[in-house]
Design a protein with these regions (language model features):
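Sec/Tat signal peptide C-region and signal peptidase I cleavage site
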Residues: 15-21
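Hinge/cleft segment of the Venus flytrap/periplasmic-binding protein
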Residues: 23, 158, 173, 271-328
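Extracytoplasmic "Venus flytrap"
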Residues: 25-49, 53, 60-76, 83, ...
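Short, solvent-exposed amphipathic alpha-helices that sit
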Residues: 38-52, 133-140, 161-180, 194, ...
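Short beta-strand elements at the ligand-binding edges of bilobed clamshell
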Residues: 61-63, 117-140, 153-157, 185, ...
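Hydrophobic alpha-helical segments within soluble ligand-binding/sensing domains
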Residues: 71, 126-151, 165, 193-196, ...
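Hydrophobic alpha-helical
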Residues: 76, 86-104, 170, 184, ...
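Flexible loop/hinge segments that line or gate small-molecule binding clefts
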Residues: 93-132, 143, 150, 156, ...
Length: 328
């Protein structure tokens, strides 16, 4: 009888363990905003992750609406509703730290993705080095204008890590061309419409003086292109650069109107989700996304690394058609 009771207890424990392992986990994604294509691609990649499609993960994607206070409120919601893990792409490098701390204090792991936060409490971060992209895009503009003339810089939201680091990279490239003058430098908040308005004003203020346009993302570079065209000017007479590899930018690269650098939203999103599941499962999980085999220089390493650096891919005449073929 005693042996039977022990056997029954063991079987019950095994069933309980199995049920716990199979229990659906709740993961929240808190991107800074969903208006532009890049974050829409990022979100779609999360939703396309095998663990989400199989039902293993219940995923909720919030819209931060480009507002740090909105993101803080969303963290409060996820904490109250006892999410198992959070993926965070903050709008503000400093303001986001309090949100991270509140989640960690509640025992919820936070995985950073795409943009950074000034906090040592992140479990891991999956993203790309924006200083590198800022340097590369500025250098492409400076190379085209022969390291002389005048440029303008259209920045992202002031205080976001991408804006800070890309500007650092922009300045590093500009320091190599001391004869180049920066005529204007303002934010357009990742917005194509805001960038178009800025560029229209600058073209009026500096007629026939602007040679290069450094847009810290593709949307803003595309807005500048629209302003140039609206002014009746030849786009190809300007050196224009952006970052992200959004669909319209790929088309503009193919048309010879700008340069761009692909930021792999899919790798950043799915890598972060694999890490979120890994930590929610207390390490009892093997990554399901194929991104870990795509980038040999970004190994999984047992899910223990603090930073996973997704490489940049310059958009070229040789790869633009292949990249366009991946867009629906």
């Amino acid at each position: 009888m005693r042996k039977l009771l022990i056997a029954l207890a063991s079987a019950t424990a095994l069933l309980a363990t199995s049920a716990a392992a199979q229990e659906k986990i709740k993961i929240g994604a808190a991107p800074y905003g969903l208006n532009a294509e890049f974050m829409q691609i990022w979100t779609a990649a999360l939703q396309d992750h095998p663990a989400v499609k199989s039902g293993e993960v219940e995923l909720t994607v919030f819209d931060g609406r480009y507002d740090a206070l909105v993101q803080q409120d969303q963290f409060k919601t996820m904490i109250t509703q006892k999410y198992n893990a959070i993926i965070f792409a903050p709008i503000d490098v400093d303001a986001g730290a309090a949100a991270v701390q509140s989640a960690v204090d509640a025992g919820i792991p936070v995985i950073g993705s795409n943009t950074r936060v000034n906090s040592d409490q992140l479990t891991s971060y999956v993203g790309s080095d924006d200083t590198v992209s800022g340097y590369l895009e500025a250098k492409s503009v400076l190379d085209k204008i022969g390291c002389k003339g005048n440029v303008v810089i259209i920045e992202g939201p002031v205080g976001q890590s991408a804006q800070i680091q890309r500007l650092e990279g922009n300045k590093k490239a500009l320091a190599e061309c001391p004869d180049v003058k920066v005529l204007e430098d303002q934010t357009a908040n990742w917005s194509r419409a805001e960038a178009q308005t800025l560029m229209e004003n600058w073209l009026t203020a500096h007629p026939n003086q602007i040679n290069g346009i450094i847009g810290q993302n593709d949307e803003m570079a595309l807005g500048a292109i629209e302003a140039v065209k609206a002014a009746g000017l030849d786009v190809k007479s300007f050196a224009i650069a952006g970052i992200d590899g959004v669909t319209d930018a790929l088309r503009a690269v193919k048309a010879g109107e700008m340069t761009s650098i692909l930021q792999d939203a899919r790798a950043q999103a799915q890598g972060a989700l694999d890490l979120a599941i890994f930590n929610a499962r207390k390490g009892d999980y093997k990554p399901e996304s194929d991104i870990w085999t795509t980038y040999k220089d970004m190994p999984w390493n047992g899910g223990k690394d603090k930073t996973y650096n997704v490489p940049w891919t310059p958009v070229t005449a040789e790869n633009v058609d292949q990249l366009l073929s991946t867009r629906k």
